[in-house]
């Protein structure tokens, strides 16, 4: 689930209705297998997303950690066996050593699969960033998370949302004192379009590169509270070093 940071501490997320017909919130159903790097993390049920970065490694959010995870690839409808899926258990699950559960700084995790997956048109990797993308860059967010800003509707079909990277100043103004250099906001200050609970760990891909990981936010799709994402470009060395050592 995307972390409802701070609001969860008072017992419930306070979210106001924006449009109860929205997808992801405010997105659309992805074309089948158009996001072949998207994975579902499963522990008897879908609980988080992730991104395939090579044939044996997935990147997700550290707050999605569970001791046992099955990674499901090639999915579109996560409640129907469509024949294209690959289910692989996690062999190693490695949270960033400086992950802070309270602030969600360094909210990134690597999963080594027990065996390499077969890459094809439905299961493919996404590139790590060659550099940090500038504000205004258009990106694709995807996941099977809640599609309502008020209430719960968990979709069967993978949802997509096109959204821009926001200036860091806007991000910091939306969440005073909460944004670190390892976080980036993506979305719309006017609200109405956002990732939500269940999308956590999933990808933000800009120009073919994984620039963000769904991390946290106040509610979903609320005005002046855009989604906050782990800034993947800060972790390329850690990712590469961790893979090499494991």
Curated annotation (Swiss-Prot):
Propeptide residue intervals: 16-23
Cross-referenced SUPFAM superfamilies: Trypsin-like serine proteases
First-listed, main subcellular location of the protein, grouped into a coarse class: secreted
UniProt-listed Enzyme Commission number(s): 3.4.21.4
Annotated GO MF terms: calcium ion binding; serine-type endopeptidase activity
Cysteine-cysteine disulfides: 30-160, 48-64, 132-233, 139-206, 171-185, 196-220
Keyword entries, A-Z: Calcium, Digestion, Disulfide bond, Hydrolase, Metal-binding, Protease, Secreted, Serine protease, Signal, Zymogen
Peptidase S1 domain segment(s): 24-244
Protein name as annotated: Anionic trypsin-2
Species in which this protein is naturally found: Rattus norvegicus
């Amino acid at each position: 689930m995307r972390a409802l940071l701070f609001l969860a501490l008072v017992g419930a997320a306070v979210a106001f209705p924006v449009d109860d017909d929205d997808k992801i919130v405010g997105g659309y159903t992805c074309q089948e297998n158009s996001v072949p790097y998207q994975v579902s993390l499963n522990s008897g049920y879908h609980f988080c997303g992730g991104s395939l970065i090579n044939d044996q490694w997935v990147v997700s959010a550290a707050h999605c950690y569970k001791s046992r995870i099955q990674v499901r690839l090639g999915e579109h409808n996560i409640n129907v066996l469509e024949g294209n899926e690959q289910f692989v258990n996690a062999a190693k699950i490695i949270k960033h050593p400086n992950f802070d559960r309270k602030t969600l700084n360094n909210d990134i995790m690597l999963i080594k699969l027990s065996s390499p997956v077969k890459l094809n048109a439905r299961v493919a990797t996404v590139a790590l960033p060659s550099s940090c993308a500038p504000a205004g860059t258009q990106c694709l967010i995807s996941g099977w998370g809640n599609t309502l800003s008020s209430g719960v509707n968990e979709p069967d079909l993978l949802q997509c949302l096109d959204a821009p990277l926001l200036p860091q100043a806007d991000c910091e103004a939306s969440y005073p004192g909460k944004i670190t250099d390892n976080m980036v906001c993506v979305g719309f200050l006017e609200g109405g379009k956002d990732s939500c609970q269940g999308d956590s760990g999933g990808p933000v891909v800009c120009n073919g590169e994984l620039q963000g990981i769904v991390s946290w936010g106040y509610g979903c799709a609320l005005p002046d509270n855009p989604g906050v994402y782990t800034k993947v470009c800060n972790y390329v060395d850690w990712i590469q070093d961790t893979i090499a050592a494991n």
